[in-house]
C-alpha cells in the first residue's frame, strides 16, 4: 500500500511539473488566438483608384473590384478605399463629426449605410455645409439626421465612430481637395478608452446642437488673421458672403 501511494505521489509530481512547464506556452498560444484591437494609419493624398465596387455591390465592404470595370482608373487599394471599407463595416451605428464634407465617394458610402438600416448621425459646421458641393444637403434629403453649430468659432472636429467601437480620426477633411492633394493622416483604432472619450464628446455636442436650442439670428463667425475670406475647394475659388451664409464661385 505504501509503495502504491509513493508511485501515485511521484506520478502526480511529474504531472504537475509538466503542467507548470507547459503553462507559459499555453498562455502564449491563447493570447495569440485572441483578436488584437485594430490599429491602422492612413496617409494622404490618396492614389486615385476605382471605388465603384465598394459603393455599389451587395455586401460592399467585402466586394472584390470588378475585372471588367469600364473606367480607366487603377483597381488597387488606396488610402481612400481603406477608409471606405472601415466606414462600410458599420452594422448598427455611424456617428460623424466633420468640419467639411464634400467628397462624393464618402457621401455615397454614408447614404449606403443609411439605406442598410444603420443609424447615422452627423454633426458639422454651419458655414462650411453651405459650400458648393457639400454633401450635407444630400444627406438631409436622404433622411439622415444632421445637426450644426451656431457658435462664433468653427466646429472643427474631424472624426467618425463606427458601431461605438471603432474610432476614425485625424487631420483629414472629407473633401476631394484634401483626399487627392493634401498631406493628411487618419488613424483607425479600436482602443476602448479613446472610443469612449470621443463618443462622450460626440454625445455632448449632439445635445448642445439640438435644433430646439437654436437662435434665429446667431452671432456671425469672425475669420481673424488665420482664416482668409477666400478658400479653394475642388479647384474652384470660393468667396464667402457672411451676411447670407452662402458662397459664390469662379473657375481658377
UniProtKB/Swiss-Prot annotation:
Residues 1-4 are mitochondrial intermembrane. Its EC number is 3.1.4.-. GO terms for biological process: lipid catabolic process; meiotic cell cycle; mitochondrial fusion; P granule organization; piRNA processing; positive regulation of mitochondrial fusion; spermatid development. MYC stimulates its phospholipase activity. MIGA1 and MIGA2 increase PLD6 self-association affinity and affects the homodimer conformation facilitating its phospholipase activity over the nuclease activity. Single stranded DNA (ssDNA) hydrolase activity does not depend upon, but is stimulated by the presence of Ca(2+) and Mn(2+). Pfam families: PLDc_2 (PF13091). Presents phospholipase and nuclease activities, depending on the different physiological conditions. Interaction with Mitoguardin (MIGA1 or MIGA2) affects the dimer conformation, facilitating the lipase activity over the nuclease activity. Plays a key role in mitochondrial fusion and fission via its phospholipase activity. In its phospholipase role, it uses the mitochondrial lipid cardiolipin as substrate to generate phosphatidate (PA or 1,2-diacyl-sn-glycero-3-phosphate), a second messenger signaling lipid. This is Mitochondrial cardiolipin hydrolase. The gene is PLD6.
